[in-house]
Amino acid sequence: MSVNSVGVQLSNASLRYNDREHATLSGLSLSLNAGKWTVLLGRSGSGKTTVLRYLAGLLDDKVEWQGTLATSDELPLTDRIAYMAQQDLLLPWLSVIDNVCLSHRFQNPASDKAQQTNQALELLAAVGLADYANAMPDQLSGGMRQRVALARTLMQDKPVVLMDEPFSALDAVTRHKLQSLACELLRDKTVVLITHDPQEAVRLADNLYVLQGTPASAHSLSVPLTSTPRVLDGECAELQQAILDQLERDYE
Protein backbone atom coordinates (compact mmCIF):
# COMPACT_ATOMS: atom_id res chain seq x y z
CA MET A 1 0.00 0.00 0.00
CA SER A 2 1.42 3.37 -0.96
CA VAL A 3 2.06 5.99 1.70
CA ASN A 4 -0.72 8.24 0.45
CA SER A 5 -3.44 5.58 0.41
CA VAL A 6 -6.43 6.63 2.45
CA GLY A 7 -9.35 4.66 3.83
CA VAL A 8 -12.84 6.12 4.12
CA GLN A 9 -15.64 5.13 6.48
CA LEU A 10 -19.20 6.26 5.74
CA SER A 11 -21.54 5.60 8.67
CA ASN A 12 -25.33 5.66 9.06
CA ALA A 13 -25.84 7.95 6.08
CA SER A 14 -29.22 8.99 4.72
CA LEU A 15 -30.18 11.05 1.69
CA ARG A 16 -33.39 12.65 0.55
CA TYR A 17 -34.00 14.89 -2.45
CA ASN A 18 -35.93 17.99 -1.43
CA ASP A 19 -38.62 17.39 -4.07
CA ARG A 20 -39.31 13.84 -2.86
CA GLU A 21 -41.25 12.70 0.16
CA HIS A 22 -39.18 9.62 0.94
CA ALA A 23 -35.45 9.11 1.38
CA THR A 24 -33.36 7.50 -1.37
CA LEU A 25 -30.76 6.14 1.07
CA SER A 26 -31.11 5.32 4.76
CA GLY A 27 -28.78 3.72 7.30
CA LEU A 28 -26.03 3.43 4.70
CA SER A 29 -22.62 2.34 5.99
CA LEU A 30 -19.63 1.64 3.74
CA SER A 31 -16.00 0.78 4.46
CA LEU A 32 -13.70 1.92 1.66
CA ASN A 33 -10.45 0.22 2.59
CA ALA A 34 -7.21 2.03 1.81
CA GLY A 35 -5.55 0.86 -1.39
CA LYS A 36 -8.44 -1.49 -2.26
CA TRP A 37 -11.33 -1.62 -4.74
CA THR A 38 -14.83 -1.21 -3.33
CA VAL A 39 -17.58 -2.08 -5.82
CA LEU A 40 -21.18 -0.85 -5.57
CA LEU A 41 -24.08 -2.50 -7.37
CA GLY A 42 -27.79 -1.79 -7.25
CA ARG A 43 -30.83 -1.13 -9.38
CA SER A 44 -31.10 2.15 -11.27
CA GLY A 45 -32.13 4.93 -8.89
CA SER A 46 -30.77 3.22 -5.77
CA GLY A 47 -28.37 6.10 -5.10
CA LYS A 48 -25.03 4.69 -6.28
CA THR A 49 -23.99 7.74 -8.29
CA THR A 50 -25.25 10.02 -5.53
CA VAL A 51 -22.85 8.31 -3.11
CA LEU A 52 -19.98 9.04 -5.50
CA ARG A 53 -21.10 12.64 -5.89
CA TYR A 54 -21.19 13.01 -2.12
CA LEU A 55 -17.67 11.62 -1.77
CA ALA A 56 -16.52 14.02 -4.49
CA GLY A 57 -18.21 16.99 -2.80
CA LEU A 58 -20.56 17.55 -5.74
CA LEU A 59 -23.97 17.44 -4.06
CA ASP A 60 -25.99 20.66 -4.25
CA ASP A 61 -28.59 22.19 -1.95
CA LYS A 62 -31.36 20.13 -3.58
CA VAL A 63 -30.22 17.18 -1.49
CA GLU A 64 -30.49 16.67 2.25
CA TRP A 65 -27.64 14.45 3.45
CA GLN A 66 -26.98 13.18 6.96
CA GLY A 67 -24.28 10.83 8.18
CA THR A 68 -20.66 10.60 9.24
CA LEU A 69 -17.64 10.45 6.95
CA ALA A 70 -14.21 9.72 8.41
CA THR A 71 -10.84 9.17 6.75
CA SER A 72 -8.06 6.92 8.03
CA ASP A 73 -5.63 9.85 8.25
CA GLU A 74 -8.26 12.22 9.69
CA LEU A 75 -7.76 14.66 6.81
CA PRO A 76 -10.57 15.90 4.52
CA LEU A 77 -11.06 14.33 1.10
CA THR A 78 -11.02 17.73 -0.59
CA ASP A 79 -8.59 17.78 -3.53
CA ARG A 80 -7.73 14.10 -3.04
CA ILE A 81 -10.23 12.58 -5.47
CA ALA A 82 -10.11 11.76 -9.19
CA TYR A 83 -13.31 10.90 -11.08
CA MET A 84 -13.67 8.63 -14.12
CA ALA A 85 -17.14 8.60 -15.69
CA GLN A 86 -18.98 6.32 -18.13
CA GLN A 87 -18.43 8.92 -20.85
CA ASP A 88 -14.78 9.62 -21.59
CA LEU A 89 -15.42 13.42 -21.53
CA LEU A 90 -12.53 14.11 -23.91
CA LEU A 91 -12.54 17.62 -25.34
CA PRO A 92 -12.75 17.20 -29.13
CA TRP A 93 -10.64 20.28 -29.92
CA LEU A 94 -7.67 19.09 -27.83
CA SER A 95 -5.13 16.44 -28.76
CA VAL A 96 -4.85 13.23 -26.78
CA ILE A 97 -1.89 14.45 -24.75
CA ASP A 98 -3.54 17.79 -24.01
CA ASN A 99 -6.64 15.97 -22.79
CA VAL A 100 -4.47 13.86 -20.48
CA CYS A 101 -2.80 16.97 -19.06
CA LEU A 102 -5.92 19.12 -18.78
CA SER A 103 -7.10 18.38 -15.23
CA HIS A 104 -3.57 18.36 -13.89
CA ARG A 105 -2.87 21.77 -15.40
CA PHE A 106 -6.02 23.25 -13.87
CA GLN A 107 -5.07 21.90 -10.46
CA ASN A 108 -1.35 22.71 -10.76
CA PRO A 109 -1.09 25.86 -12.93
CA ALA A 110 2.43 26.64 -11.76
CA SER A 111 3.91 23.21 -12.52
CA ASP A 112 6.51 22.75 -15.25
CA LYS A 113 4.79 22.06 -18.60
CA ALA A 114 7.70 20.05 -20.01
CA GLN A 115 7.63 17.81 -16.96
CA GLN A 116 3.85 17.44 -17.32
CA THR A 117 4.22 16.44 -20.95
CA ASN A 118 6.86 13.82 -20.15
CA GLN A 119 4.68 12.38 -17.41
CA ALA A 120 1.68 12.27 -19.74
CA LEU A 121 3.73 10.49 -22.41
CA GLU A 122 4.77 7.87 -19.86
CA LEU A 123 1.13 7.31 -18.91
CA LEU A 124 0.04 7.05 -22.53
CA ALA A 125 2.73 4.41 -23.00
CA ALA A 126 1.39 2.58 -19.94
CA VAL A 127 -2.10 2.41 -21.48
CA GLY A 128 -0.72 1.40 -24.89
CA LEU A 129 -1.26 4.71 -26.68
CA ALA A 130 2.27 6.09 -26.98
CA ASP A 131 1.83 6.53 -30.75
CA TYR A 132 -1.40 8.52 -30.39
CA ALA A 133 -0.23 11.47 -28.28
CA ASN A 134 -0.90 13.99 -31.04
CA ALA A 135 -4.07 12.35 -32.37
CA MET A 136 -7.49 13.95 -31.94
CA PRO A 137 -10.26 12.18 -30.01
CA ASP A 138 -12.40 11.57 -33.12
CA GLN A 139 -9.58 9.42 -34.52
CA LEU A 140 -9.87 6.93 -31.65
CA SER A 141 -12.10 3.94 -30.99
CA GLY A 142 -14.28 3.78 -27.89
CA GLY A 143 -11.79 1.57 -26.08
CA MET A 144 -8.90 3.85 -26.96
CA ARG A 145 -10.81 6.89 -25.73
CA GLN A 146 -11.43 5.22 -22.37
CA ARG A 147 -7.73 4.40 -22.13
CA VAL A 148 -7.03 8.12 -22.62
CA ALA A 149 -9.54 8.83 -19.84
CA LEU A 150 -7.72 6.32 -17.62
CA ALA A 151 -4.39 8.04 -18.36
CA ARG A 152 -5.99 11.40 -17.50
CA THR A 153 -7.21 9.95 -14.19
CA LEU A 154 -3.73 8.63 -13.41
CA MET A 155 -2.22 12.00 -14.34
CA GLN A 156 -4.17 13.60 -11.48
CA ASP A 157 -2.35 11.25 -9.06
CA LYS A 158 -5.04 11.30 -6.38
CA PRO A 159 -5.22 8.67 -3.62
CA VAL A 160 -8.98 8.13 -4.12
CA VAL A 161 -10.45 7.28 -7.53
CA LEU A 162 -14.21 7.22 -8.17
CA MET A 163 -15.35 5.27 -11.24
CA ASP A 164 -18.95 5.47 -12.46
CA GLU A 165 -19.51 2.61 -14.94
CA PRO A 166 -16.39 3.51 -16.95
CA PHE A 167 -16.39 0.31 -19.03
CA SER A 168 -20.11 -0.31 -19.56
CA ALA A 169 -20.33 1.04 -23.12
CA LEU A 170 -17.49 -1.15 -24.43
CA ASP A 171 -17.59 -4.54 -26.12
CA ALA A 172 -16.86 -7.59 -23.96
CA VAL A 173 -13.22 -8.12 -24.95
CA THR A 174 -12.28 -4.43 -24.70
CA ARG A 175 -14.08 -4.18 -21.36
CA HIS A 176 -12.18 -7.21 -20.03
CA LYS A 177 -8.83 -5.77 -21.12
CA LEU A 178 -9.53 -2.35 -19.64
CA GLN A 179 -10.66 -3.88 -16.35
CA SER A 180 -7.31 -5.65 -16.09
CA LEU A 181 -5.38 -2.54 -17.12
CA ALA A 182 -7.18 -0.33 -14.60
CA CYS A 183 -6.63 -2.90 -11.86
CA GLU A 184 -2.90 -2.89 -12.60
CA LEU A 185 -2.42 0.86 -12.94
CA LEU A 186 -4.66 1.86 -10.03
CA ARG A 187 -3.13 -0.63 -7.62
CA ASP A 188 -2.60 1.00 -4.20
CA LYS A 189 -5.27 3.62 -4.94
CA THR A 190 -8.53 3.57 -2.99
CA VAL A 191 -11.04 2.90 -5.75
CA VAL A 192 -14.83 3.03 -5.66
CA LEU A 193 -16.41 1.44 -8.75
CA ILE A 194 -20.07 1.56 -9.70
CA THR A 195 -21.21 -1.17 -12.06
CA HIS A 196 -24.37 -2.96 -13.18
CA ASP A 197 -22.31 -5.99 -14.26
CA PRO A 198 -22.03 -8.74 -11.60
CA GLN A 199 -19.16 -10.37 -13.50
CA GLU A 200 -17.18 -7.12 -13.50
CA ALA A 201 -17.82 -6.80 -9.77
CA VAL A 202 -16.61 -10.35 -9.13
CA ARG A 203 -13.40 -9.77 -11.11
CA LEU A 204 -12.42 -6.49 -9.45
CA ALA A 205 -13.89 -6.20 -5.94
CA ASP A 206 -11.90 -6.34 -2.73
CA ASN A 207 -15.09 -5.17 -0.99
CA LEU A 208 -18.53 -5.55 -2.52
CA TYR A 209 -21.82 -3.91 -1.59
CA VAL A 210 -25.29 -4.17 -3.09
CA LEU A 211 -27.52 -1.13 -2.54
CA GLN A 212 -30.93 -2.68 -2.03
CA GLY A 213 -34.34 -1.78 -0.64
CA THR A 214 -36.48 1.37 -0.46
CA PRO A 215 -34.88 3.46 0.87
CA ALA A 216 -31.67 1.72 -0.10
CA SER A 217 -29.05 0.50 2.35
CA ALA A 218 -25.79 -1.34 1.71
CA HIS A 219 -25.57 -5.12 1.95
CA SER A 220 -22.03 -6.51 2.03
CA LEU A 221 -21.16 -9.74 0.23
CA SER A 222 -17.98 -11.73 0.89
CA VAL A 223 -15.55 -11.97 -2.03
CA PRO A 224 -13.00 -14.71 -2.81
CA LEU A 225 -9.56 -14.34 -1.24
CA THR A 226 -7.85 -14.59 -4.64
CA SER A 227 -6.10 -11.52 -6.05
CA THR A 228 -7.73 -9.22 -8.57
CA PRO A 229 -8.43 -9.15 -11.46
CA ARG A 230 -9.78 -12.63 -10.80
CA VAL A 231 -9.92 -15.55 -13.18
CA LEU A 232 -13.56 -16.56 -13.15
CA ASP A 233 -13.94 -19.95 -11.47
CA GLY A 234 -16.62 -21.84 -9.57
CA GLU A 235 -16.32 -19.65 -6.48
CA CYS A 236 -16.71 -16.55 -8.63
CA ALA A 237 -19.77 -18.06 -10.29
CA GLU A 238 -21.34 -18.61 -6.87
CA LEU A 239 -20.69 -14.99 -5.93
CA GLN A 240 -22.13 -13.79 -9.22
CA GLN A 241 -25.31 -15.75 -8.47
CA ALA A 242 -25.42 -14.33 -4.94
CA ILE A 243 -25.23 -10.81 -6.39
CA LEU A 244 -28.10 -11.54 -8.77
CA ASP A 245 -30.17 -13.03 -5.94
CA GLN A 246 -29.62 -9.88 -3.87
CA LEU A 247 -30.46 -7.57 -6.77
CA GLU A 248 -33.63 -9.49 -7.62
CA ARG A 249 -35.12 -8.68 -4.21
CA ASP A 250 -35.84 -5.18 -5.50
CA TYR A 251 -37.97 -6.64 -8.30
CA GLU A 252 -40.16 -8.93 -6.21
Language-model region placement:
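A short, proline-enriched helix->beta-strand linker immediately N-terminal to the Walker B motif
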Residues: 155-159
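Helix-to-loop junction immediately C-terminal to a conserved catalytic motif
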Residues: 56
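Hydrophobic anchor residue at the start of the ABC signature
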Residues: 150
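Conserved ABC ATPase "signature" region
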Residues: 113-132
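Short coil-to-helix segment of the ABC ATPase nucleotide-binding domain corresponding to the Q-loop/switch region
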Residues: 94-103
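Conserved ABC ATPase signature
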Residues: 136-140, 144
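Helical segment within the ABC ATPase nucleotide-binding domain
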Residues: 175-187
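Conserved beta-strand-loop-alpha-helix hinge in the C-terminal portion
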Residues: 213-244
